[in-house]
Amino acid sequence: MRSFLLTFACLITFNLFAQKDYWQQQVNYKINVTLNDQNHSLKGLEEIEYINNSPDQLSFLWFHLWQNAYKNDNTAFAKQVSRDKKGTDRLKKFKDRGYIDSLDFVVDGVKATYETDPKNIDVIKLILPKPLSPGSKVKIKTSFYVDIPEYISRSGHNEQSYMICQWYPKPAVYDRKGWHAFPYLDQGEFYSDFGNFDVTITLPSNYIVGATGILQNADELKQYKDIGSKNVAADSRKNTVSYVAPSASIKSLNYKAENVVDFAWFADKDFVIRYDTLKLNSGKVIDVFTYHHSNGNKNWVNSIEYVEDGTKAYSSYFGEYPYPVVQAVEGPKNEMSGGMEYPMITLITSPNASVEMLDAVITHEVGHNWLMCILATNERTHAWMDEGINTYYQFRYEADKYRYNSIFGDQIPKDVRQKPAPEFQELVY
């Protein structure tokens, strides 16, 4: 396998050398957003710095408004889901639709207009007041409003539990092959530019939040760490330490993340926080958080172990984990997947998972920090480069730790499970 990876890395390197003057765009964000948990909505103001590193002059930018994918049954998302009976049943139960609107673009101080893609209401073209030259940058501001849908696919709410993903107006990728503006799909993931995020979330003070990046509110972060450490030390679901909300009715939490491809956040009043630190082989120490429900899957009591073991394993496979924090969040059941990854944080949607399966799903989603977040390939076009390689290494992790494979589960004969890890993996993979 090492020889395969070396060959694969060399091919990528040679390909990059063959590309004259390689470039990629950079998109930096400053977002202020307020959660209304009475009508399940977001009201936001977004400032984008778009840096044109391409050799081309750009007269417009394509944007994704992926929350509009939930708006009606005519979107690419709805059409894809409805292709089978299970999906049709999902849509029939989907009553609380969502959308994004109230956009008001200003580009370098000049009001700008946009056009909705004729085929996809979750894709728009922003017309720049003047062309953006190579090597130049532009400041884009817009307000936005999101009616948060009930949870059905990655983003949404389950009563007053919030999974806020693909939630802000986001420029599509422009690379050497041109624009990659595509609609949101249930089966089919993403392609995003790298950038820095400065996100302030205002919400009722009794919510616990997990998000991409580092929490800048020192008092809030200290309380999360203190509570989480005590809950890990207790090693039990009983007598967990609870979060104490500030006296004010609302709070504003600021998160910063550097050189990432996306930003997601999760908020719930019922989260049990668990926290530890992990020392990597280089001596670097990172924060490890998990957030789970008090009445959820009992196996989350060991979730810190799963995140840490997965992070250590993938650091040995691919190179050291590059970010300052790694987190996992327990979410509601998703009919189509066991979890969904975002930079530094992952949502796990497998409420009935066994010990081995929960460990496998958490490790798989944490593993995407290397493949989806660092390599940042076009997942819509080349899904195997993320999911395929990641699944192989997930199976390797399962074999090493449990002599387990999440496809075959308990069907694996006992004598096979007693074999050494390499032989076990050869037999079941």
Where are these regions (language model features)?
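N-terminal, polar/Ser/Thr-rich
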Residues: 17-43, 55, 158
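Short, hydrophobic/aromatic-enriched beta-strand segments in well-ordered soluble domains
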Residues: 46-48, 52, 65-67, 136-150, ...
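A surface-exposed beta-strand-loop module
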Residues: 51, 86-160, 240-248, 253
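Solvent-exposed beta-hairpin/edge-strand motifs
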Residues: 63-110, 164, 202-207
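Glycine/proline-rich low-complexity spacer/linker segments in large multi-domain proteins
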Residues: 73-86, 145-197
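Catalytic Zn2+-binding segment of zinc metalloproteases
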Residues: 369-382
